[in-house]
UniProtKB/Swiss-Prot annotation:
Residue positions of covalent lipid attachment, annotated as N-myristoyl glycine: G2
Region called Autoinhibitory domain, residue ranges: 318-348
PTM remark: Autophosphorylated. Phosphorylated by MPK5.
Entry protein name: Calcium-dependent protein kinase 18
Chain positions recorded as Ca(2+) 4 binding sites: D477, D479, D481, K483, E488
Gene name as annotated: CPK18
Binding site for Ca(2+) 3: D447, D449, D451, Y453, E458
Record organism: Oryza sativa subsp. japonica
Active site location: D178 (proton acceptor)
Membrane topology type: Lipid-anchor
UniProt-annotated stretches for the region Disordered: 1-25
EC number(s) per entry: 2.7.11.1
Metal-binding as UniProt keyword: yes
Source organism phylogeny: Eukaryota, Viridiplantae, Streptophyta, Embryophyta, Tracheophyta
Length: 512
């Protein structure tokens, strides 16, 4: 059951592929008119017929067909997506093709993304040449399993590969937007074949701090925030959560006879973890799925965080955990916080134990290339350079290090890193009682006399700051009584996670 309609409705998010971005520049003519149909010149190579021989038909879509083909020079077998120029009657159809090629190029080389070779064109068609995957769709393998479900071990292998794709997309400023079993192919028919993401037709580049306002995707896998017209990278993780639920129990977590009924289920109801086989599935697996299917996208695990979860770790180890885009965003955001908010976050970070910080430990280790227990300016530069939409200059990176580096030694240790990258909203949503306990403990570090308030004198004593403290208190002092209550302190901490995860994204549901 799909939500896909014409692609003309989806460009209202201000993304690079949309009205204001790079996706339009290449398409615009001298007067801003995009040539369509046979008039379209994509600038791709024109020698497809000389390079490849088309073979059997593999499948077809709205605008074209996919064929097996052979490279005339190397005899290598490939897949070719042939798109009819005559069907590109609107400029957005031209943009869609250019964007898909751009995305395939951006993700080139990732082990779980179908390999892109080249794009060609002639007067009638565009040809996108890709890796040939002959193992069939993930959906077909699910249906072939007994009771249409995987063992936990096999499911974890599949889910890990999907999460790696999502994390890589998000680092490149991309959201897939149509994660579903049909869009993952196995390289071969072998049982242990690698999984490859394909069909980036609904994917798009995102601008940090923005959200998509259109409804796209496939009904069973669409995230609540997509239906609310305010979606971003987190929607991919929700879709993977739905797929994981299906892999483990053979049923969809949200189902109804109608599309609108499915949407109501997604928005209002929680998945059922009581029916068989869930009582026989490990608590660790259930915890994993539940944290991917959190309705609030701010509290949902990111793709990189999910890869650090105990259930999905390869052999119990966090092997090749990619950088988490939200961790990099949080570090940039930390610079903008008031001194009091920074101190409050450091106090909160100090209350967490090693198990609660396992995902951030993985991220710290990924950035700490020389494994000396601290992050240098150069290591942080290298990490932030991988955040494609941002790629900060040297002075900006130094500014981040100086803000995070509380002991002013020019390095970032793990405790400093945690304070700057903590997902406060996840703490609030995942375990309310634990949040209350941790925030109380952080508050108590400032409330020296234990009277239930933080005064300017106590703040000065705990921070060592000189000069007037009153301006620092004003941000949190909602009732203007000159001191900070526990509720006001908690409110201040919660605002730390409000802006750092607000990032934006593209479409097989399609509603304008």
């Amino acid at each position: 059951m799909g939500l896909c309609s014409s692609s003309s409705a989806r460009r209202d998010a201000g993304t690079p592929g949309g009205g204001n971005g790079a996706g339009n520049k290449d398409n615009a003519g001298r007067k801003g008119i995009v040539a369509c149909g046979k008039r379209t010149d994509f600038g791709y190579d024109k020698d497809f017929e000389a390079r490849y021989a088309l073979g059997k038909l593999l499948g077809h879509g709205q605008f074209g067909y996919t064929f097996a083909a052979v490279d005339r020079r190397s005899s290598e077998r490939v897949a070719v997506k042939r798109i009819d120029k005559n069907k590109m009657v609107l400029p957005v159809a031209v943009e869609d093709v250019k964007r898909e090629v751009k995305i395939l190029k951006a993700l080139q080389g990732h082990e779980n993304v179908v390999h892109f070779y080249n794009a060609f064109e002639d007067d009638n068609y565009v040809y996108i040449v890709m890796e040939l995957c002959e193992g069939g769709e993930l959906l077909d393998r699910i249906l072939a399993k007994k009771d249409s479900r995987y063992s936990e071990k096999d499911a974890a292998v599949v889910v890990r590969q999907m999460l790696k794709v999502a994390a890589e997309c998000h680092l490149h400023g991309l959201v897939h937007r149509d994660m579903k079993p049909e869009n993952f192919l196995f390289k071969s028919t072998k049982e242990d074949s690698s999984l490859k993401a394909t069909d980036f037709g609904l994917s798009d580049f995102i601008r940090p701090g923005k959200h998509f306002r259109d409804i796209v995707g496939s009904a069973y896998y669409v995230a609540p925030e997509v239906l609310k017209r305010k979606s971003g990278p987190e929607s991919d993780v929700w879709s993977i959560g739905v797929i994981t639920y299906i892999l483990l129990c053979g049923r969809r977590p949200f189902w109804d006879k109608t599309e609108d009924g499915i949407f109501k289920e997604v928005l209002k109801n929680k998945p059922d973890f009581r029916r068989k086989p869930w009582p026989n599935i490990t608590p660790c697996a259930k915890d994993f799925v539940q944290k991917l299917l959190v309705k609030d996208p701010r509290a949902r695990l990111t793709a990189a965080q999910a890869l650090s979860h105990e259930w999905v770790r390869e052999g119990g180890q966090a092997s090749d955990i990619p950088l988490d885009i939200s961790v990099l965003h949080n570090m940039r955001q930390f610079v903008k916080y008031s001194r009091f908010k920074q101190f409050a976050l450091r106090a909160l970070a100090s209350t967490l134990n090693a198990e609660e910080l396992s995902d951030l430990r993985d991220q710290f280790n990924a950035i700490d290339v020389d494994k000396n227990g601290t992050i240098s300016l150069e290591e942080l530069k290298q990490a932030l350079a991988k955040d494609v939409p941002w790629r900060l200059k040297g002075p900006r990176v130094l500014e981040i290090v100086e803000a995070i580096d509380s002991n002013t030694d020019g390095l970032v240790d793990f405790e400093e890193f945690v304070a700057a990258t903590l997902h406060v909203h996840q703490l609030v949503e995942h375990d309310t009682e634990k949040w209350k306990s941790l925030s109380q403990a952080a508050f108590d570090k400032f409330d020296v006399d234990g009277d239930g308030y933080i005064t300017s004198d106590e703040l000065r004593m705990q921070t060592g700051l000189k000069g007037s403290i009153d301006p620092l208190l004003e941000e949190a002092d909602i009732d203007r009584d000159g001191k900070i209550s526990l509720d006001e302190f908690r409110r201040l901490l919660k605002t730390a996670s409000m802006s750092s995860r607000n990032v934006q994204t593209p479409r097989s549901v399609h509603r304008s």
